[in-house]
Amino acid sequence: STKNGRDSNSQRLGVKVYGNQPVKAGGIVVRQRGLTFKPGNSMKVGKDYTLFSCKDGIVQFETNGKTKFVHVY
C-alpha cells in the first residue's frame, strides 16, 4: 500500500454571481480567502471574507488601480 492516499475536499471558492446579473438581498456574490474583492455599494463582508448583497439589484465589478470592488445597484 501507499502512504499518499489522501485528498481534501474542494473549498468551492470564487465568484458566484457575475457582472450585470441579478442578486437578491443576502445572496452570496464572492467566496474568497482574504479580501481579494472589497465590498462596494450595498455589499457586506462575512466572517470568512464572503461578500454578500444587502439589497436586491444588479451586480457590478469595478477595478480602481489594483483594488477590485463589487457593487450592487
From Swiss-Prot:
One of its GO terms (biological process) is translation. Keywords: Chloroplast, Plastid, Ribonucleoprotein, Ribosomal protein. One of its GO terms (molecular function) is structural constituent of ribosome. Its main location: plastid. InterPro entries: Ribosomal_bL27, Ribosomal_bL27_CS. One of its GO terms (cellular component) is chloroplast. It is found in: Plastid, Chloroplast. Pfam families: Ribosomal_L27. Belongs to the bacterial ribosomal protein bL27 family. This is Large ribosomal subunit protein bL27c. The gene is rpl27.
